[in-house]
From Swiss-Prot:
Biased composition (Pro residues): 484-505
Polar residues composition bias: residue spans: 76-88, 141-157
Protein's cellular compartments: Nucleus
Record's compositionally biased regions (Low complexity): 44-75, 128-140, 158-198, 506-516
Annotated function: Probable transcriptional regulator.
Keyword list, A-Z: Coiled coil, DNA-binding, Nucleus, Transcription, Transcription regulation
Gene Ontology CC, one term: nucleus
Region (Leucine-zipper), start-end ranges: 569-576
Gene3D superfamilies: 1.20.5.170
Coiled coil residues, start to end: 94-137, 228-258, 330-407
Domain of life: Eukaryota
Region (Disordered): 38-88, 128-198, 461-516
UniProt protein name: Probable basic-leucine zipper transcription factor R
């Protein structure tokens, strides 16, 4: 191994490392492919024929031994020949003992081979690590295995041809030896012993592999192998030759063994344990040997093709684990795909089942509906059929009764004469003779016919009996004895009971006559039956025609009745709809009339009162003011009682009622900010400069005094006072800016009205405050006013919109600052603030009374025709309004208390 240290240090020569590590892994791969344990591996070697080349002596016995050895070596893999040997030698105890010893030797060889392989692997790993360190020390970089250059590997040569030549020479020697064996019995015995010994030696040679050969394979890599196909062909040829030779030998041995017997006595063999070895176990061992040969051939094939070996010597332990995980995941991928496919198939099957169930349910519903329809149709058909049957039975009964009466009355004259003759004979003779057999037959037939007629009458009488005339009733009540059926009676009168016997010729003639008469009667009966059938068919046709006519009439009548019924329903529905429509129109007319009256009253009040009703506050805002006032009164009462829970509840209620204050404020501003009100303010000369008299708690010197007193009363902390002062400062800045913007917009709007809407020629300026001193108004007339442009109109509308927004911002500024001030304070302090400020201090009752007084005063000023009466009426109204004011105040205080 020391010879290979120096060349392995170069990075270009790493082939032996690959082969050394590849052989140990190749052994494991072959085990996995054939599913064979380590205990059953037998490394057979076909190169044992070298012993034959070294032992070519002149003695015939030695040549026989060598030839037998070669034959046994070549025939180990053939199961047919071994089966024959097993059959011949399975009962020999020596053979069994030898097999046992062979098995032990085989096991020992296997253990030795495994130990040697382990030692080689350990040595290789140690040397590989040492060489890596040497490489790193010399080249100062980590070792990396280069790619394999198979061109550098020496070519593989075949040396098995020499072995084959040796085998052929040995086979020729066998033929000569076999001839010599046939001459003497002693030589045959010696040959048999020598054959047994040679078998043992050859088996041992095949089982045990020389350690030197393994070392040569591992180190030098100069094992000369043969391709797999050529080797198989050679083995087949050898097996065929060996089979032919063995057959010849067996024939010769059989010829020799018949006259001879074994001379050498066999010694008894004492075994420690009883060996039970049967033919199948031996066959299994031989099969294992053949499998081992296949393993060796596969190893040789892999040695010939080193490109297929994966260079696993480069992988570290952690890399091997990752490699194994990747292989496991690759193996599991197809199973996962199969599982996914099965899941998809299951989902599809479930969906198909659901669809089938839905279809079945729909089909069942349809079948049920069809069954119900069919049942209804069957019931209707059954009812119609019953009606038709009843009608048919009535008609048949009416038609059959006169026919039965006629049949019952018609009696043939022959029977009447016969009955009269019988009665006369009985009266003359005064004998109690019995009737003749003919008369008895006639009577029996008569009675049977009577019974059938009675049964028919009973069946027909189940229906309601029709009305008969008196003649028909008499015919019906005639005695039953008068009814005699016409058939089965001879036309001639019967012969007397005791006449003289006529001759045979006369009897024959009489019989012939009787037969002719009977035939005539039968023909007549057939004709009558045919006539009756024709009559019945005609009657049935007539009945069917009548039924069809009756059905047509009924269908026509039913259709007409349905039409009449539908017409009645349609007319009734039309009348009801007409009534409903008339009622709707009347209600609409009533509502329109009420609206008209209300509008007339409003117009009259507007004319008289000067549009006071139009300027009235909205009912929603009035409701909000009244509710807020009531809540503040309740808060005042809770402060007196010092009830914190009620205060908190009332404050929540107060904030809930004030939610709509912004929307109501916009509605009130829209009433003021429009061209009509602005025109009136401009005509009047209104100037929004004067501040209101209401106290503003956020701005001005008076607010400072009020807030200082409130802080003392509400026990406000210094932190709260700082926040309140900063809030007031911010409010002052924003309110001053908004007030200036409002004044500018108001001036611009007033100038627009004065220039374009109210040009008064030769008149001085009404309010000189709007203009500067040098500004003059042009002396114009209505004719000289130019039309307005669209741009000017849009600009004026935008100015009005901005004025509305500024007013809303100014009003909402006060509300927002008040809300932030309430958030700074505690609930009790907030309640004190609401009670002291009282934003909802407007008394709407007083305001309404003042409006009524104003309307009455205007009416007094307008009524000039009859001033006394109008003045007295107006004074009455004023007094009445004052009385209402007092009553409202009393009611309001009563509600609060």
């Amino acid at each position: 191994m020391d010879n290979f240290e120096n060349p392995l240090l170069a990075p270009d020569q790493d082939v032996l490392l690959y082969l050394l590590d590849g052989y140990s892994q190749l052994q494991q791969l072959q085990k996995q492919q054939f599913n064979i344990h380590d205990d059953n591996i037998n490394y057979n070697n076909n190169n044992n024929n070298n012993n034959n080349n070294n032992n070519n002596n002149n003695n015939n016995n030695n040549n026989n031994n060598n030839n037998n050895n070669n034959n046994n070596n070549n025939n180990i893999g053939s199961p047919q020949i071994m089966n024959e040997n097993i059959e011949t030698n399975s009962n020999d105890p020596q053979y069994l003992e030898r097999l046992q010893s062979i098995q032990q030797q085989q096991h020992q060889c296997q253990t030795q081979i495994q130990q040697q392989l382990q030692n080689y692997q350990q040595q290789y790993e140690d040397q590989y690590q040492q060489r890596q360190q040497q490489y790193q020390d010399q080249y100062q970089k980590p070792y990396s295995s280069p790619p394999l250059n198979f061109n550098s590997i020496p070519p593989i040569t075949n040396n098995n041809n020499n072995n084959n030549n040796n085998n052929n020479n040995n086979n020729n020697n066998n033929n000569s030896n076999s001839n010599s064996n046939s001459n003497s019995n002693s030589n045959s015995n010696s040959n048999s012993n020598s054959n047994s010994n040679s078998n043992n030696n050859n088996i041992n040679n095949n089982i045990c592999i020389n350690n030197n050969d393994i070392s040569i394979f591992l180190l030098n890599n100069q094992i000369q192998l043969q391709p797999l196909q050529q080797q198989q062909q050679q083995q087949q040829q050898q097996q065929q030759q060996q089979q032919q030779q063995q057959q010849q030998q067996q024939q010769q041995q059989q010829q020799q063994q018949q006259p001879t017997q074994p001379t050498q006595p066999t010694k008894p063999i004492q075994l420690t344990q009883p060996i039970q070895l049967t033919q199948p176990t031996l066959l299994e061992e031989l099969k294992d040997i053949s499998i081992q040969q296949q393993l060796l051939s596969a190893i040789q094939q892999t040695a010939q093709s080193p490109q297929q070996i994966h260079p696993l010597q480069q992988l570290q332990p952690y890399q091997l684990q990752s490699y194994q995980q990747i292989q496991a995941s690759q193996q599991l991928q197809p199973y996962q795909q199969l599982i996914q496919l099965q899941q998809l198939q299951l989902q599809q099957l479930e969906e198909e089942k659901r669809q089938q169930q839905k279809q079945l349910l729909l089909q069942q519903q349809q079948l049920q509906e069809q069954q119900e329809k069919l049942q209804q149709q069957l019931l209707q058909q059954q009812k119609q059929q019953l009606k038709q049957k009843v009608k048919q039975q009535k008609q048949q009964h009416q038609k059959q009764q006169p026919q039965q009466q006629q049949q019952s009355i018609q009696i043939p004259p022959e029977l009447q004469n016969y009955i009269l003759n019988n009665n006369n004979n009985n009266n003359n003779n005064n004998t109690n003779k019995t009737l003749s057999p003919i008369s008895e037959m006639i009577q029996n037939q008569f009675l049977n016919n009577q019974q059938t007629i009675l049964n028919q009458n009973n069946s027909t009488l189940q229906l309601p009996t029709p009305f008969y005339s008196p003649q028909q009733q008499q015919q019906q009540h005639t005695p039953i004895s008068s009814f005699i059926p016409p058939p089965s009676l001879p036309s001639s009168p019967p012969s007397p009971p005791s006449p003289p016997s006529p001759p045979p010729q006369q009897q024959q003639q009489q019989q012939q006559q009787q037969q002719q008469q009977q035939q005539q009667q039968q023909q007549q009966q057939q004709q009558q039956q045919q006539q009756q059938q024709q009559q019945l068919q005609q009657q049935q046709l007539q009945q069917q025609q009548l039924q069809q006519q009756h059905q047509l009439k009924e269908s026509y009548e039913s259709k007409e009745s349905i039409k009449k019924y539908n017409q009645n329903i349609a007319s009734r529905n039309y009348r009801l709809k007409k009534k409903d429509y008339i009622k709707e129109i009347e209600n609409k007319i009533a509502t329109l009339s009420l609206e008209n009256n209300r509008l007339e009253k409003e117009n009259g009040s507007i004319r008289t009162n000067g549009s006071i009703e139009m300027m009235r506050m909205e009912p929603e805002s009035m409701k909000m003011l009244m509710d807020g006032k009531l809540i503040i009164e309740n808060i005042k009462h809770a402060l007196i009682i010092d009830d914190e829970k009620s205060l908190i509840y009332l404050l929540h209620q107060y904030h809930r009622t004030i939610d709509q204050r912004y929307s109501l404020l916009e509605k009130e501003v829209n009433k003021l900010i429009n061209p009509y009100t602005q025109l009136r303010l401009c005509c009047i000369g209104y100037v929004p400069k004067s501040s209101p008299l209401v106290l503003n708690i956020f701005q001005g010197p008076e607010s400072d005094k009020w807030l200082n007193l409130f802080k003392i009363e509400a026990n406000i902390t210094p932190e709260q006072s700082i926040k309140i002062d900063s809030l007031r400062f911010q409010y002052g800045k924003v309110s001053s800016r908004l007030s200036n913007e409002l004044l500018e917009l108001d001036l611009i709007i007033k100038r627009f009205f004065i220039k374009n809407v109210l040009p008064t020629p030769d008149t001085p300026l009404l309010n000189s405050d709007y203009y500067s001193e040098g500004e003059l108004i042009p002396n114009t007339t209505t004719e000289s006013i130019a039309p307005l442009n669209n741009f000017e109109l849009l600009d004026f509308a935008s100015k009005l919109e901005s004025l509305k927004n500024k007013i809303i911002l100014n009003a909402s500024l006060g509300l927002d600052t008040f809300a932030t001030l309430c958030s700074i304070l505690t609930p009790k302090q907030e309640a004190l603030l609401l009670v002291r400020v009282n934003l909802f201090c407007i008394d709407l009752h007083h305001h309404d009374i003042l409006g009524e007084v104003w309307t009455n005063v205007n009416q007094i000023s307008n009524s000039l025709s009859n001033p006394l009466t109008s003045f007295s009426d107006s004074m009455k109204k004023i007094n009445f309004s004052f009385l209402q004011l007092d009553n409202n105040n009393n009611n309001y205080h009563y509600k609060i208390n």
